[in-house]
């Protein structure tokens, strides 16, 4: 259960320090360029015993910085965990880049985060040092609700940065000329569009998977007014964005504008067009961060017809597979097991595959129910990834979570209990989400295991009460996440009154089909299993698919154990989605189910040693 002690709302403090970054060269001890960065140490949240902080490194120079290495030391505070960097040392602490964030392009920044204990003191603001740092800094104060730009990721995460400049692969065209008459550009010149509305610069980006990417446009606007742009992905089929490009004061003064967009798997054509008759500012470069990306093909655009939305599908199904009973699964052994001191179980997982990385939020139990986050790129190394506790963070514990990206708000949402609540973040890798907010007005007693899915017009909130009834609340897409009232989806009071329709409802949209899948956990004569139904609308009616103990959606009776049976029953979990947004799409041709399995008995339910395993549907 959740710790109901409220974390004090402390105004986050930001202190900037200067630090040096190691630049690559013939010898690491000698910098090939006098590249430096400004380091910002941010107290993100603080409570009675601990704190979370972020260190942001910003490249204020005109040259790329490669391979950074920073240090800091506390008087009384101690670091307990961190993310988005490789850490070593025990006060002083050292952080070095991971494989995907070691290069910082001019004007760009990276961040890493940490959690610590105050040890009777206040949250300290240590000086961050490095090998070479000449950049001036100033102090500032940030809102306590600020969200770090980057954060948690396991050491196995892989991503890449792409820099597109004129006369290079991936630069497709400019409606104008390539000029070099103003200093400060970084390539062979800069793109100077015609002074006309609609004049454009076009790039091509090849992404290995669908997902969110961060685009940074380096530009100079020496005019007296904004020269804003309209950014279109694949002709508008995968996104339309407005980019603010204010004046920089001179044509030799370069600044950056950053925007998060959704790219589809394969080739993407990105077009930035002028919205005024003055045309665009001078455009020096476009950089792309997130996932694995490379220069694309200017002559083609990946078809978006098989991708339901800019983030609704990370795969392109080549066939339509009918999901019909009986179903057969194979199970892995335990892939994620308790490894932190005192942890007894890990259960109730929510899993999102985003930018080639699996992100898992889950419940763990030590002396109470708490929450954790982990991420990895390969199931074979899942257990080696850090298990980061969310206990004491701003969001607190988020038992039985569901995580997804809500496109209309351009934010990640986490749905949790008790009572029903939601939290948000701009970065799924950051386990310090916003403070929880109420989800359902008029929520009945005992409501749990909340699940959200949306179509093009409405969002649906499913939940249980351990009373043999499945409930739903409905709101418009524009009104999300505000739900009010509820109705009954179905009820089944056989057995002891709740065992046939128990908990852990999941609802998904099947890729390429006008068909939805509903799963609900049950227990009848033996261990837990899942029943299932399908419908052509989220409003129902729901038709049984595999809904008995003998013919379950997933349970002991239809699972083969490739490495030996280790779990008794198939309990609370999620299918691995083909996308990551609110439409909850799954590929019926390649279903995988991350579930909690009881690996042994417990003296009480709370002490059952649950672990996480993966089911794969047999074809």
Swiss-Prot record:
Subcellular location: Secreted
Annotated Pfam families: CBM_2, CBM_6, Glyco_hydro_62
InterPro entries, per the entry: CBD2, CBM2/CBM3_carb-bd_dom_sf, CBM2_carb-bd_dom_sf, CBM2_CS, CBM6, Galactose-bd-like_sf, GH62_arabinosidase, Glyco_hydro_beta-prop_sf
Signal peptide from the UniProt entry: 1-37
Entry keyword Hydrolase: yes
SUPFAM superfamilies: Arabinanase/levansucrase/invertase, Carbohydrate-binding domain, Galactose-binding domain-like
Gene Ontology molecular function terms on file: alpha-L-arabinofuranosidase activity; polysaccharide binding
Record-annotated disulphide pairs: 39-133
This protein's pathway: Glycan metabolism; hemicellulose degradation
Region (Disordered): 300-319
GO BP of this protein: L-arabinose metabolic process
Cellular component annotations (GO), alphabetically ordered: extracellular region
Miscellaneous section: Acts only on high MW substrates, in which arabinose is linked to a polymeric backbone.
Protein name: Alpha-L-arabinofuranosidase C
Organism: Cellvibrio japonicus (strain Ueda107) (Pseudomonas fluorescens subsp. cellulosa)
């Amino acid at each position: 259960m959740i710790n109901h002690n409220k974390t004090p709302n402390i105004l986050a403090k930001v202190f900037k320090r200067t630090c040096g970054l190691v630049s690559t060269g013939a010898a690491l001890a000698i910098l090939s360029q006098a590249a430096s960065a400004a380091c910002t140490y941010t107290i993100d949240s603080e409570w009675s015993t601990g704190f979370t902080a972020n260190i942001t490194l910003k490249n204020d120079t005109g040259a790329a910085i490669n391979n950074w290495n920073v240090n800091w030391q506390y008087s009384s505070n101690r670091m307990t965990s961190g993310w988005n960097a490789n850490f070593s040392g025990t006060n002083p602490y050292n952080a070095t880049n991971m494989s995907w964030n070691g290069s910082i392009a001019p004007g760009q920044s990276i961040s890493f985060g940490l959690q610590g204990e105050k040890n009777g003191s206040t949250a300290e603001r240590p000086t961050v040092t490095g090998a070479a740092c000449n950049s001036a800094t100033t102090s500032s104060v940030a809102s306590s609700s600020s969200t770090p730009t980057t954060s948690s990721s396991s050491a196995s995460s892989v991503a890449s940065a792409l820099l597109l400049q004129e006369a290079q692969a991936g630069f497709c065209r400019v409606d104008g000329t390539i000029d070099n008459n103003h200093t400060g550009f970084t390539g062979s010149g800069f793109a100077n569009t015609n002074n006309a509305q609609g004049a454009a610069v076009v790039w091509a980006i090849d992404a290995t998977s669908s997902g969110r990417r961060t685009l940074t446009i380096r530009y100079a606007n020496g005019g007296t007014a904004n020269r804003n742009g309209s950014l279109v992905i694949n002709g508008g089929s995968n996104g339309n964005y407005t980019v603010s490009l204010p004046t920089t004061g001179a044509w030799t003064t370069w600044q950056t504008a950053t925007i998060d967009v959704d790219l589809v798997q394969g080739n993407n054509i990105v077009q930035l067009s002028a919205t005024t008759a003055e045309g665009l500012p001078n455009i020096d470069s476009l950089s792309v961060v997130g996932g694995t990306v490379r220069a694309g093909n200017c002559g083609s655009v990946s078809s978006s017809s098989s991708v339901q939305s800019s983030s609704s599908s990370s795969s392109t199904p080549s066939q339509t597979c009918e999901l019909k009973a009986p179903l057969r699964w194979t199970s892995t052994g335990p892939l994620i097991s308790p490894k932190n001191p005192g942890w007894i179980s890990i259960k109730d997982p929510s899993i999102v595959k985003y930018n080639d990385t699996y992100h898992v939020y889950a419940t763990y139990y030590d002396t109470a129910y708490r929450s954790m986050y982990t991420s990895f790129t390969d199931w074979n190394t899942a257990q080696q990834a850090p298990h980061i506790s969310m206990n004491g963070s701003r969001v607190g514990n988020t038992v039985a979570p569901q995580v997804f990206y809500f496109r209309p708000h351009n934010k990640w949402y986490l749905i949790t209990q008790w009572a029903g609540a939601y939290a948000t973040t701009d970065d799924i890798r950051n386990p310090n989400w916003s403070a929880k907010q109420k989800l359902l007005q008029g929520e009945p007693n005992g409501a749990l295991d909340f699940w959200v899915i949306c179509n093009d017009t409405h969002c649906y909130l499913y939940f249980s009460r351990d009373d043999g009834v499945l409930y739903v609340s409905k709101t418009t897409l524009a009104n999300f996440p505000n739900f009010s009232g509820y109705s009954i989806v179905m009820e089944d009071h056989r057995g002891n009154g709740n065992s046939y329709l128990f908990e852990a409802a999941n609802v998904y949209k099947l890729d390429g089909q006008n068909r939805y899948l509903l799963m609900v956990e049950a227990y009848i004569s033996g261990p837990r299993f899942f029943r299932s139904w399908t419908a052509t609308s989220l409003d129902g009616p729901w038709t049984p698919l595999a809904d008995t103990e003998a013919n379950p959606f997933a349970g002991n009776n239809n699972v083969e154990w490739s490495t030996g049976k280790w779990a008794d029953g198939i309990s609370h979990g999620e299918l691995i989605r083909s996308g990551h947004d609110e439409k909850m799409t799954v590929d019926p041709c390649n279903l995988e189910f991350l579930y909690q399995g009881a690996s042994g008995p417990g003296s009480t339910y709370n002490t059952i040693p649950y672990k996480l395993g993966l089911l794969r549907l047999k074809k």
